Regions:
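N-terminal auxiliary segments of SAM/dcSAM-dependent transferases
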Residues: 2-74
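Conserved class I S-adenosyl-L-methionine
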Residues: 55, 61-112, 130, 147, 203-227
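Class I SAM-dependent methyltransferase SAM/SAH-binding core
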Residues: 116-163
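A short acidic, Gly/Pro-enriched loop at the edge of an enzyme's catalytic core
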Residues: 162-174
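A short SAM/SAH-binding and catalytic strip from SAM-dependent methyltransferases
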Residues: 173-185
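A short glycine-rich, Lys/Arg-flanked "PGG" loop and its adjoining helix->strand segment in the class I
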Residues: 187-199
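Acceptor-substrate binding/catalytic loop of class I
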Residues: 226-243
Length: 284
């Protein structure tokens, strides 16, 4: 998917992942481990499929199924754009240390949850600000299609949200930090997230809520007619507060709260900034 650099992760991070990893195409199937003569993990296997382990990072991106191939070039172009922006020093799409809303998200998670959490679309930062803000209460594992060139400070697997490569009922919680609308198929990703969470496991979705205006309605109508097109140059999908809630409920989650994250405005009606929300739910 990208040129892999010499940067990976410590061997102990990989070893900590092995008990949780599964076939991305069928996550009820655990992966078998292939080691070299020195005992180093070099590949993970499921049936006839073999997935590389590169510099202690399991590379678990499957071949996309036929139905997803039409959107693949657009998806690849978007991923390449974000990756290049990061390499050029623009961390705008990532929750870096100076991201106040990201820090608030981490604090909310720390107050309401604990245990082992999955960051779905963790990006390429060594440690996103919400991870730092929730440390002590939450232990993080990250998954992202980007291999990256940064040594992450948490266990990491290269993978897709639609094909989360983890066994069922492993995680106490999961977070989509501004990533749900980047997926080719967010519905599929949410269903897989439901699978990897323990019963009553927490789900946090941080995203920009769209207003029910002309642009959104036109885009939604085109989607309904079968025209696969992005909402804008950065987002494959768009959600209002209500439509996101509907998608979560259809995936088997019960929504507990939707927290308005703008620190400058008292409510959505008076806000002219990005309308960012943190939706809090749990697996039913």
């Amino acid at each position: 998917m990208e040129e892999v650099t010499a940067v990976g992760q410590p061997a102990e991070y990989l070893e900590s992942l092995l008990d949780y990893l599964a076939c991305p195409l069928d996550n009820s199937v655990p992966l078998s481990v292939a080691r070299n003569a020195a005992g180093k993990v070099v590949a993970l296997r499921s049936g006839d499929a073999e997935y590389q382990v590169v510099h202690n990072v399991p590379c678990l991106v499957p071949r996309l199924e036929e139905g997803a191939r039409g959107a693949l070039p657009r998806w690849q172009a978007h991923q390449k754009k974000m990756w290049q922006e990061y390499k050029d020093g623009d961390e705008g799409v990532f929750a870096a240390e100076g991201n106040d809303i990201g820090r608030r998200v981490g604090e909310i998670i720390a107050r309401s949850a604990e245990g082992l959490y999955l960051d779905v679309g963790c990006g390429a930062l060594a440690r996103p600000v919400y991870m730092a803000a929730s440390s002590g209460r939450v232990e993080w594992i990250g998954v992202d299609p980007f291999f990256g060139d940064t040594v992450r400070q948490f266990p990491f697997a290269q993978g897709l949200g639609e094909y989360l490569p983890f066994l069922p009922e492993v995680f106490d919680g999961a977070l989509y930090a501004g990533t749900i609308y980047h997926h080719l198929d967010p519905r599929r990703s949410l269903r897989r997230a439901h699978s990897v969470l323990k019963p009553m496991g927490k789900l946090f979705v941080w995203c920009t809520a769209r207003r029910l205006g002309r642009k959104y309605l036109i885009w939604r109508g085109l989607r309904a007619l079968g025209f696969a097109r992005m909402y804008n140059e950065d987002h494959q999908w768009a959600f209002t507060r209500k439509s996101l809630r509907t998608q979560l409920e259809r995936a088997g989650f019960a929504v507990e709260d939707q927290v308005f994250l703008c620190e400058a405005c008292p409510d959505l009606a008076s806000c002219d900034h990005k309308n960012e929300y943190l939706t809090i739910a749990h697996r039913m």
